[in-house]
Amino acid sequence: MSDPRYQIDVSVVTRFLADQSQPEQNRFAFAYTITVKNNGLVPAKLLSRHWVITDGDGQVEEVRGAGVVGQQPLIDIGASHTYSSGTVMTSKVGTMQGSYQMKATDGKLFDAIIAPFRLAVPGALH
């Protein structure tokens, strides 16, 4: 069981960006909006991200970096941080998953898990 002091929940909304995609060149652009909510008992700062992006052909790309969209937000108890970003894939369908490294104000380092979510061109899945 995880420690209730360090409870970060991540929710994701995705969308296909037809105007930024070039299907004839196997270029499919997607945007995602992520909400990181602190349901724990201690404020926590989002230090870094780790993404595992898998396209429909099984190709895997890992992305690591500081913060999210240039920020390392401190998320208070009961508060949330929402941001939008995007990715380009070479297939109509893929998944993303990963984690955020967090640092609570009491000094504890912990990971907030980002459950797998699907990116798909509308109509690509039956």
UniProtKB/Swiss-Prot annotation:
GO biological process annotation, one example: error-free translesion synthesis
Domain ApaG as annotated: residue spans: 2-126
InterPro entries for the chain: ApaG_domain, ApaG_sf, Uncharacterised_ApaG
HAMAP family: ApaG
The protein, known as: Protein ApaG
